[in-house]
């Protein structure tokens, strides 16, 4: 009898032990599932928060280096009909950064204001230059143009107006934004599936972006002796012939696409910027004056790259820069 009692007790304990292990495993599985399902939520914190509809991670192009995506933020509230769209191209020296820059710092402030003014915003990833890679600056531009072509091709399902496309970028993205604005839609073709898709650029804003690579002295902020070109390797692919350098420099210089019929451009530059010197804004302004092209410049005093203050507070303030940027887009929304 005592033996039966001991065996029964042992059986109960073993059963409870197995049940505990099963419960632990189930709990672990459930926790893993929760963690997996929470990953998108963690990632979502990096996206621009507008309070309105968003279409995130839209695949617009496949490349040998990987798939390319864009994030589309809709106006709040949505106006009737199709929406004008601002293409945002991030900075990072054509070698770093991502479309998530739209949700950071001043860019988040700008784009929240713009979606409230009736614009959609498309923040674009493009291929990045690497020291040992084959991607060059022109690929960054081609990818960004293909993003517009994708939006145009899918304008009906996405609700985007391909005849009201705007551009904005900072630093390297400022150069890309100028290229999007000033070069023709047919130029720099990329994905054959998107080739020939029509669209129309209306206006654009460049924050501290370069306008000309051929004039290398524009990058020499203090006219230093022995100044060396820093961006050549990002324009000319390894293995290129020496005679290919100048045509590629000219091809990637937005100023060469400027005409009297170009869409309006606003360039905002800091007078203490040693990365992309203020010379670029003045040089573009001079060319625009000769052509009677619609280019405006705004010079920020005591401002380095990324509106970093140098020696004193920047003037006008970042708030004024934001307001001027938003007003420029809104002014060119009317009548289009």
What does each of the following model-derived ranges do?
Residues 33-81:
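N-terminal cap/lid segment of alpha/beta-hydrolase-fold proteins
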Residues 47, 63, 215-257, 263:
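Mobile cap/lid helix-loop segments that gate and shape the active-site cleft of serine hydrolases
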Residues 81-93:
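Short beta-strand element of the alpha/beta-hydrolase
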Residues 102-106, 110-111, 116-117, 122-162, ...:
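Catalytic nucleophile-loop/oxyanion-hole region of alpha/beta-hydrolase
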Residues 149-220:
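Primarily recognizes the serine-hydrolase "nucleophile elbow" in alpha/beta-hydrolase
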Residues 261, 267-269, 273:
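Short beta-strand/loop motif that positions the catalytic acidic residue
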Residues 274-283:
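Conserved alpha/beta-hydrolase "acid-adjacent" motif
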Residues 314-336:
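Catalytic active-site module of serine/aspartate enzymes centered on a nucleophile-bearing elbow/loop
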